[in-house]
Amino acid sequence: MREYRALQTLAATARFSRAPRFFDFGDDESGNPSSKASKVMPDDDQSLSEQRAQGATLLHAPPQPLTLRINGAEHNLTIEPRVTLLDALREVLGLTGTKKGCDRGQCGACTVLVDGQRINACLTLAMMHDGREITTVEGLGEQGQPHPMQQAFMDCDGFQCGYCTPGQVCSAVALLDEVKARQASMLTEGDQLAPGALSEDEIRERMSGNLCRCGAYPNIVKAIHSVVLRQA
């Protein structure tokens, strides 16, 4: 984790190293730029070059050992610190149920559960989840025994092309836990969700981070609502 934070800091330094060396702090009594400004940035180009070189070195840091707990199984890996959780799942472990859509955290196709909380796997580094419990769509059910949410998506035709479905299902499973915990959303009146108050608008709000280009939203909402009613 320390290496990751150092990587962020030095990468940012390298990226913005062409910023003006002085900021406008006003003139001193002699009419020259204030001496305060000279302390803001390094005094010579050599120090900037050294910072760039150090940042580049960390961007190509050697592979590090890592243990990921995925769907109840431990995986001991050795990967570069810059590898995202999404790429570790798909490219290293072959768990291709988690989809790469926008790769920018906007579509939700890569949604997985980490310690029960839904996250976008494309926006987080694998190194940040050492030892944590990760659940992908492959871990929700078994062949012939799908998770109730998976079954509901099939029964309600909650998909068309199916590319976004793994992320939709993982997000919907997390939604069930949120409802049980009575967690509020942006639409909830009050600090807690009242029993039986999960409306279609609430479902749409809670699923707004998962996009479907095919437009299967009505059936997705129907599928989620059916599971909530059965578990009530």
Language-model regions, residue ranges each:
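Amphipathic alpha-helical interaction segments
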Residues: 12, 30-33, 225
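Short hydrophobic transmembrane-like helices used for membrane targeting/insertion
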Residues: 1, 13, 40-41
